[in-house]
Amino acid sequence: MTQIPMTLRGAEKLREELQHLKSVLRPQIIAAIAEAREHGDLKENAEYHAAREQQGFCEGRIQEIESKLSHAQIIDVTKIANKGIVIFGATVTVLNTHSEEKKIYQIVGDDEANFKKDLISVNSPIARGLIAKKISDVAVIHTPGGEVEYEILDVKYC
């Protein structure tokens, strides 16, 4: 598996979720399975089957997070000499040249992306179009709705 780019905040968020799954959810599910077993016949025990299904989802998510963290390339943009260039982890202020709308995006890893919070995946069309550009450059982004031009107004690394 290739390395997965991730911010410090994104890695910490995954570690917190992993800790919650292992120390809170997993014991709850084990207790639910034990309680359901006490009800007798497992073939027709809906509580038992629901708990086992939940256990499968929990264990699958634990494995997924552990795999991502083991392949994570944690990037701290504050320690990179970047000289105003848009890179992974940067917070970019852009101006849509057609609508004159300003937007601020932070380029993050796939697990951290949340478009409603203006956190865009490094693999998104917008991020791919902005990366390696600098202040005052115009990036042409190819979207399903057509081309959008963004002028880069500011780049921060925090």
UniProtKB/Swiss-Prot annotation:
Q: Does the keyword Ion transport apply?
A: no
Signal peptide as annotated in the record: none
**Entries under PROSITE patterns matching the protein:** GREAB_1
The record's keywords, sorted A to Z, are: DNA-binding, Transcription, Transcription regulation
Keyword DNA-binding belongs to the record: yes
Q: Which SUPFAM superfamilies match?
A: FKBP-like, GreA transcript cleavage protein, N-terminal domain
Q: Name one GO molecular function term.
A: DNA binding
Extract the InterPro entries matched here: GreA/GreB_C_sf, TF_GreA/GreB_CS, Tscrpt_elong_fac_GreA, Tscrpt_elong_fac_GreA/B, Tscrpt_elong_fac_GreA/B_C, Tscrpt_elong_fac_GreA/B_fam, Tscrpt_elong_fac_GreA/B_N, Tscrpt_elong_fac_GreA/B_N_sf
Gene Ontology biological process terms from the UniProt entry = DNA-templated transcription elongation; regulation of DNA-templated transcription elongation
| Record family assignment | Belongs to the GreA/GreB family.
Q: Which NCBIfam families match?
A: greA, PRK00226.1-2, PRK00226.1-4, PRK00226.1-5
Q: What role does this protein play?
A: Necessary for efficient RNA polymerase transcription elongation past template-encoded arresting sites. The arresting sites in DNA have the property of trapping a certain fraction of elongating RNA polymerases that pass through, resulting in locked ternary complexes. Cleavage of the nascent transcript by cleavage factors such as GreA or GreB allows the resumption of elongation from the new 3'terminus. GreA releases sequences of 2 to 3 nucleotides.
- Protein name stated in the entry: Transcription elongation factor GreA
Q: Which organism is it from?
A: Hamiltonella defensa subsp. Acyrthosiphon pisum (strain 5AT)
